[in-house]
């Protein structure tokens, strides 16, 4: 089922690329230089894990590479994502934490995602984006938190890019996103808001 969802997500994203290119205005790319972004995010978990790790957050670094004469950019991203327990954690929960006892309030599940994807500007500075890649559990005892120390991860979102700095070459992106690290027992997923501060590299 998760593979079907990922394929559906890819089809939707490719359809958006095709539609955006068909409606492309040649003068649009003048404010889209190569950019390096530094981001922060905050959200809440969804699915079964939300009963144990209710809050989520993270920091990220992203490289945005605009395609010439196109409203599409290629994204490369990495960072640190964490889920914080809100009221205790039962080690017997669906494969998480087997044989290691019980986790208490404030316990943190930590991951490093490495992803690539596309960012599309269908209308002016409004954008949609989607990424996929690998998520690495970096807790000292990864089996306390996951079945898979390394797992597939995907995310998608939409937002608005606010111009900043000289000629608007820098920007601040504000977006709403969904992220999912599917695995047996439910995995880790979240809905959150993200702010990325982008700096033009040329």
Model-derived features: positions:
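Membrane-embedded beta-strand positions of outer-membrane beta-barrel proteins
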Residues: 36-40, 74-78, 116-118, 128-132, ...
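Bacterial Sec-dependent N-terminal signal peptides
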Residues: 1-27, 195
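Predominantly the C-terminal beta-signal and adjacent terminal strand-loop region
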Residues: 24, 31, 154-202
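Flexible, solvent-exposed loop segments that connect beta-strands
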Residues: 44-51, 79-111, 136-150, 172-174, ...
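Short glycine/proline- and aromatic-enriched beta-strand/turn motifs that initiate or cap beta-hairpins
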Residues: 21-81, 188-192, 198-202
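Hydrophobic, lipid-facing positions within transmembrane beta-strands of outer-membrane proteins
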Residues: 36, 55-61, 110-116, 134, ...
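Outer-membrane beta-barrel strand-turn architecture
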Residues: 67-71, 120-126, 162-166, 199-201
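Internal catalytic-core helix/loop-beta-alpha segment
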Residues: 122, 127, 131-141
């Amino acid at each position: 089922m998760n593979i079907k969802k990922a394929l559906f997500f890819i089809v939707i994203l490719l359809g958006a690329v095709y539609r955006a290119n068909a409606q492309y205005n040649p003068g649009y790319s003048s404010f889209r230089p190569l950019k390096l972004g530094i981001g922060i995010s905050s959200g809440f978990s969804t699915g079964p894990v939300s009963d144990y790790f209710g809050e989520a957050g993270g920091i990220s670094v992203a490289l945005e590479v605009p395609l010439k004469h196109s409203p599409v950019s290629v994204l490369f991203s990495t960072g640190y994502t964490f889920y914080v327990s809100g009221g205790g954690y039962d080690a017997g929960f669906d494969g998480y934490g087997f044989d290691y006892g019980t986790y208490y309030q404030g316990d943190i599940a930590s991951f490093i995602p490495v992803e690539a994807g596309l960012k599309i500007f269908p209308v002016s500075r409004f954008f949609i984006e989607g990424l996929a890649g690998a998520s690495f559990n970096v807790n000292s005892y990864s089996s306390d938190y996951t079945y898979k120390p390394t797992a597939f991860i995907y995310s998608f979102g939409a937002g608005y890019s606010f111009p900043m700095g000289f000629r608007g070459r820098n920007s601040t992106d504000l977006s709403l996103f969904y992220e999912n690290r599917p695995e047996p027992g439910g995995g880790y997923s979240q809905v959150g808001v993200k702010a990325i501060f982008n700096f033009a590299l040329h």
